[in-house]
Amino acid sequence: MNKVVYTAIFGGYDDVVEPTYRPDGWDFVCFTDTDLVSEFWEIRNVLPLYEDSTRNARRYKVLPHRWFPNHEISCWIDGNAQVRGDINELLDYVQNVDFATFDHNQCYLDPRNCVYEEANVIISAGNRNTQNRPNEVPFDNPYYHYQDNPNLILKQMKRYQSENYPSQNGLLSSMVLLRRHSEEKCQQTMEDWWTEIKYGSKRDQLSFNYSAWKNNFEFNYLEGDVRNNKHFLHMGRHKKKRVRQ
């Protein structure tokens, strides 16, 4: 069984995080448009398709079946996450389903269980930051303090409501995605998820649970808080863009 841990770093916002534990039988691959060097990761330099670094990374994040046709199982980790335990211990979570991730409702600092609530939190934070720091807002970017365009998010949530997508229907925390991506149902759901991100909000946590619901796609939640658990550690906020000498 071929297995791969992978990440994607675009626009120079992260250095690749070296694992503190290397599980047996896994390849490690990092996609990037940046001059990164690692003795641990296989660095694959690729060209970005979008001006938005976040959306470029999300494309690799959501579609492992396109990048790893010879691997059966993949484990995505965000660029600011670290592998620190034997992730072979997690394979039972994708024994009877094709997808496992962490439950946002198990996050100690900010438990949530609803995409509509997540949307409200994102927009409220942007409103608050814009009000508190108006002098930082560029003339040509009124949504500078928002994680994404609030009008786009609201439009997307209204569409979900019009399709009768239920509230309190779960919310993933997408720092880690464990998938049996060679399976057709998983591939179709990931393609639909990517369509939501490509044409809607780049905030992927807003659209996964909807995409799973739409496809009747079953998945498991991994145990624990995504930011600090036996197998993974969140290393803090993404670094500011830096220029290599």
Each language-model region and where it sits:
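Residues that flank catalytic or metal-binding motifs in active/ligand-binding sites
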Residues: 1, 24, 61, 77, ...
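N-terminal anchoring/stem segment of glycosyltransferases
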Residues: 1-58, 67-71, 199-203, 214-217, ...
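A residue-level signal for conserved active-site and pocket-lining positions in enzyme catalytic cores
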Residues: 5, 28, 65, 80, ...
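Hydrophobic/aromatic beta-strand patches that form the interior of the parallel beta-sheet core
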Residues: 6, 29-31, 44, 75-77, ...
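Cell wall/extracellular polymer interaction/catalysis modules
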Residues: 42, 46, 77, 101, ...
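Short acidic (Asp/Glu) patches
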Residues: 55-63, 89, 154-161
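GT-A fold catalytic core of metal-dependent nucleotide-sugar glycosyltransferases
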Residues: 62-116, 122
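Catalytic core and acceptor-binding pocket of nucleotide-sugar-dependent glycosyltransferases
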Residues: 125, 130-244
